Structure formats: structure tokens, C-alpha cells
């Protein structure tokens, strides 16, 4: 009888582990990090989180919402984690905790203007209106540059206003700016705001220190793996060599 009970407990334990779910929030409007393709969520963050979840035994359940709603949803326990190309800024760290960074290559941020604009570099934009996504790190860059940030729910809205000359410029992560420059007419890049290794991390509730540690340890485990390298090459091919160089340094 004891043997049967032990076997049943093992089966139930295995089933429980196999079906544990993690509800993860993202904003699928930030190519190549996360975006919709044929009504399916794809991107670097999406595949990376699925890989991390697999390593830890989680089934990832995705929740798509506006960028500025992500951290409030996390705090209200509507989701368990956030991955959305989000930087772990000091201001955000007051409200939530973060994993270690999961991006291991240097980046930057494009300064984009209307193609009829006479602006030639970011310094020309002091006192000018610059479109940024609500809650994004680009808002800080705009302020640091002496510009007046105008907040948008997403970069598509900001760039449409730029096309129509309703704002003077948009600041956007270069990997995403590159995608918009390919497909949108009437805009051009004039400058880049350089960034060191971005502090791009996964957000968790303050109380979920164990969960944050689990994911941090797993990021360290997979960063040297062929799977991670393939994701970098797939979504950030222009940064692949830089990624390899940084791995050798570490």
C-alpha cells in the first residue's frame, strides 16, 4: 500500500511540474524583440523566454498589452513576469526587481526625422518635440538631449506623426528603427545615441526573489549556448560579431 501511495505521489508531482504555468507580459510592437507575424507572437524576447521557460520547466503563457501597462499589471499580479526589451532603470527598480541582463552586445538608439527636415544631428533638437514610447528609456535620452518628449503608446504612432510633420523627431532603439526605416516612407535617420551594454532584463515582483534568481541563473547558463547564439544571429545579425567579442571578454 505504501508503495502505491509513493508511486501516486511521484506521478502527481511530475504532472504538477510539467504543467506549471508562467504568465508573461510583453508589448508585441517592438520588432525584432517582440512583434506579431501572421497573428503569431514572434521575436528575440519571445524565443528567449520560451527557451528559459523550457530549461526551468515552465509553460509560458503570453499576455500582450501596452508597454506602460506592463509593470502595473505585474504589481497587481495579473502576470508573473515582463520581457519587452525593457531596461532595468533605477526608477523601475524602485517598483520591481529584475533578472540579470540578457543582452550581451552593445547597441544604440536612432534619431529619426522627417525626410524634409533640415536637422542633421541630435544637438539640433534641443527645445524641439521628440516622440518616444511611454515609459521607455528613450524618454530619458530625449530629456538629456534638451528635447521635449512627446509620449506615445507605441513607436508606430510616433513615426506616423513624424511622417505628417506633427513632431520634430523620434528616438527609438536602433534595431527597431532599422525595421521602420525599411518599410516607412518619408523618414530618415540623422544620428545615433550610443549605448553601452544595455541593461535589458526580465522584470519580476519585488517579492519574487526566488523566481528572479532562477531566471538569472538560467540566463548565465544559456548565454554561451548554441541556442542563444542562433537567436542573436537570427534577430540581430548586425550585432553578432560584437556579441561573440563580448562573450570572449567575459
Residue ranges and their predicted role:
Residues 61-74, 134-135, 150-164, 196-198:
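Short helix-initiation/N-cap motifs at beta->coil->alpha
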Residues 25-30, 63-68, 77-89, 115, ...:
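Beta->alpha turn/N-cap motifs
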Residues 28, 104-113, 178-220, 238-250:
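Periplasmic-binding protein-like
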Residues 46-55, 116-119, 123-124, 129, ...:
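Extended ligand-binding regions for polar small-molecule ligands
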Residues 72, 85-95, 141-144, 168-196:
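A ligand-binding cleft/hinge motif common to bilobed small-molecule-binding domains
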Residues 58, 87, 100-148:
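A conserved helix-loop-strand patch within extracytoplasmic ligand-binding domains
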Amino acid at each position: 500500500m505504501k508503495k502505491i501511495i509513493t508511486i501516486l505521489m511521484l506521478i502527481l508531482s511530475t504532472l504538477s511540474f510539467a504543467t506549471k504555468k508562467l504568465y508573461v507580459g510583453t508589448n508585441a510592437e517592438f520588432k525584432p524583440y517582440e512583434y506579431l507575424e501572421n497573428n503569431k507572437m514572434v521575436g528575440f524576447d519571445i524565443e528567449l523566454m520560451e527557451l528559459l521557460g523550457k530549461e526551468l520547466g515552465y509553460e509560458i503563457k503570453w499576455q500582450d498589452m501596452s508597454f506602460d501597462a506592463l509593470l502595473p499589471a505585474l504589481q497587481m499580479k495579473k502576470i508573473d513576469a515582463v520581457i519587452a526589451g525593457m531596461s532595468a532603470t533605477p526608477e523601475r527598480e524602485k517598483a520591481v526587481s529584475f533578472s540579470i541582463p540578457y543582452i550581451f552586445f552593445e547597441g544604440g538608439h536612432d534619431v529619426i526625422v522627417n525626410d524634409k527636415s533640415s536637422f542633421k544631428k541630435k544637438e539640433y533638437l534641443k527645445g524641439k518635440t521628440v516622440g518616444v514610447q511611454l515609459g521607455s528609456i528613450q524618454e530619458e535620452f530625449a530629456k538629456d538631449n534638451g528635447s521635449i518628449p512627446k509620449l506615445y503608446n507605441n513607436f508606430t504612432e510616433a513615426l506616423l506623426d513624424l511622417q505628417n510633420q506633427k513632431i520634430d523627431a523620434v528616438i527609438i532603439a536602433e534595431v527597431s528603427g532599422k525595421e521602420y526605416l525599411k518599410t516607412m516612407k518619408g523618414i530618415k535617420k540623422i544620428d545615433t545615441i550610443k549605448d553601452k551594454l544595455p541593461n535589458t532584463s526580465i522584470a519580476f515582483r519585488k517579492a519574487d526573489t526566488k523566481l528572479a534568481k532562477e531566471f538569472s541563473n538560467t540566463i548565465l547558463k544559456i548565454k554561451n549556448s548554441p541556442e542563444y547564439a542562433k537567436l542573436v544571429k537570427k534577430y540581430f545579425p548586425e550585432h553578432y560579431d560584437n556579441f561573440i567579442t563580448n562573450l570572449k571578454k567575459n
